[in-house]
Every structure is written in C-alpha cells, then in structure tokens.
UniProtKB/Swiss-Prot annotation:
It is an enzyme of class 2 (transferase). Its EC number is 2.1.1.266. Belongs to the RlmJ family. GO terms for molecular function: 23S rRNA (adenine(2030)-N(6))-methyltransferase activity; RNA binding. Monomer. The keyword Transferase applies. It catalyses: adenosine(2030) in 23S rRNA + S-adenosyl-L-methionine = N(6)-methyladenosine(2030) in 23S rRNA + S-adenosyl-L-homocysteine + H(+). GO terms for cellular component: cytosol. This is Ribosomal RNA large subunit methyltransferase J. Keywords: Methyltransferase, RNA-binding, rRNA processing, S-adenosyl-L-methionine, Transferase. The active site is at D165 (proton acceptor).
C-alpha cells in the first residue's frame, strides 16, 4: 500500500523540526574536507508547491514554515534554515514552495560529497528523478529505502548520514526502522543515523525507542517537539528525531532552538519539547 503523499504535509511543524536537525548534521559533516555520503530512504518528490490542492486542503504549512517566514528575531541556526527555503522561493517575499529533505541536502552538498535518494511510490519517483536530473552528485533510485540501508553501507567515504523517515502508514514501519538501523549499524557503526517519527499514538512510538534500546547501540539522542499533549484521538500531536552518533554540538543546539520553535510554532501555549538520551555514550 503506497497511498501516502507528503504534499499534504509539506512545511508543517514536523518538517520544520526534521529539516533543521538535518541541516545541522550536514553542516557538521562539512567541517571536515573529506567527502561524505548521504542516504535518504523515503525521499518523496523533493520539492513541494504550497498552492497545490493537497497543500491547500490541509494548510499545515501555515502552522509550520509559515510561522517562521516573516519573523525578524530568528535564532542564527533557524535563520539559516529559513534562508534556504527563501532561496527556493527565488528570494521573494511570498512563500510558494517548500523543500523536502533531498533538496535541503543537495543544497548543502559539496563537489566531494554524494547523495542517494530512494523513493518507491510510482507517481513520486519520476518527479523526484526529474528534480535532480542535472545534479551530478545525486543518484535517484526507485527502490525500497529500508533495503537500501543494507545494500549501500558502508559507503566508500566512510563518513555520512542516513535519514530514515517512512510515512508509518503501515504498522510494520515501526519495526522495519529498527531492523534497518541494526543492519546499517553492523556495516557502518561510525555513521550518523537520523530517524524521523510521528507521535500519533504514543505506544506505537515507544516501539521504536524500546527496539533501539534492545540493539545495545550507544549514543542515541531523542529530539521531540509537541504541538499539543498526547491524546487517544487520531492525529499527530508531536514529532521527533532520533539521532544515532549525533554531532557533539547537536544536543546543545537543539536545547537552544526548541524554546523559540515551540513559542513561535505553537502560540496557543500547548507546545512542549524534549531533548534526552535514549542511550548515552
């Protein structure tokens, strides 16, 4: 079943959190001259038009990137992220397009770095391929992203980031995430892994945390932003990023960023945030 389309959700609060974390990790990898490898397991189309029927139907971006767009007091790290999105909008004042994780990563790649983008959805893959057809550093595959973790690691660069962000439309995705991490870590223990997760039902989310703890892997950081308290009702109340082998600066950076994000994205005052270690070093 491949019914999920990210265009309904592009630019929402979950994307904001995910893409700021992605940017900070890639910026850290760029501190060394040696090239790195980036794998995006569930790439989507890479770029989203916010005037599309899907985006307008939900309007989720208005409570995400839309609430940061005109802010004049952005913390430095958030300002760099917003600047990237404004570049995609041709520097204009109007927010018309939003970047998916592949486009944010491609913007940060240097000539010595490379990326592999995988997307299995039959209608999304051709768009993704077309969006990166001129980028020599980027390879696009129509394939199962979970399987690519095992197939492509370790990379020849011996440095890199794996982003795993499935839609979780299948309950198996929660277990497949943990399995992919186990397979990847066995092959590439020094790599950084970033897992995006939604909080729809907290018990499902805990399956990822418990599964990762059971692997025995160390240095697992959890970063979470909630827009409202957990609920038994259907709907995403929060989202987060689990980062294995995070840059040493990431914990501090997110603790500085999240109070501002929570206040700005959730002006109603129902938001909260967490930065904590699932397993320390």
């Amino acid at each position: 079943m491949l019914s999920y389309h990210h265009s309904f959700h592009a630019g929402n609060h979950a994307d904001v959190l995910k893409h700021i974390v992605l940017m900070l990790i890639l910026e850290n990898l760029k501190l060394k001259e040696k090239g790195f490898f980036y794998l995006d397991t569930h790439s989507g189309v890479g770029r989203y038009r916010l005037s599309s029927n899907e985006s307008e139907k939900t309007g989720e971006y208005k409570e995400g990137i839309g609430r940061l767009w005109d802010q004049t007091d952005l913390p430095e790290d958030i300002a760099r992220y917003v600047k990237m999105i404004k570049k995609l909008n041709y520097g204009g004042k109007e927010l018309r397009y939003y970047a998916g994780s592949p486009l944010i990563a491609a913007e940060l790649l240097r000539s010595q770095d490379r990326a592999l983008l995988t997307e299995l959805h039959p209608s999304d893959y051709p768009i993704l391929r077309n969006n990166f057809s001129d980028d020599k550093n980027v390879t696009v595959k129509c394939d199962n992203g979970f399987q690519q973790v095992k197939a492509t690691l370790p990379p020849k660069e011996r440095r890199g980031l794996v982003l795993i962000d499935p839609p979780y439309e299948l309950k198996d995705d929660y277990d497949l995430v943990v399995k992919a991490i186990e397979e990847g870590y066995k092959r590439f223990a020094t790599g950084t892994y970033a897992i995006w997760y939604p909080v729809v039902l907290r018990q499902q989310t805990k399956r990822i945390f418990k599964g990762l703890e059971a692997t025995g892997i160390r240095k697992i950081l959890k970063i979470e932003l909630a827009v409202r308290p957990d609920s038994d009702q259907r709907g995403m109340t929060a989202s987060g990023m689990v980062v294995i082998n995070p840059p040493w600066t990431l914990e501090t950076q997110m603790k500085e960023i999240l109070p501002y994000l929570t206040k700005t994205l959730v002006p109603e005052g129902t938001g909260s945030w967490t930065v904590e270690w699932i397993t320390p070093e």
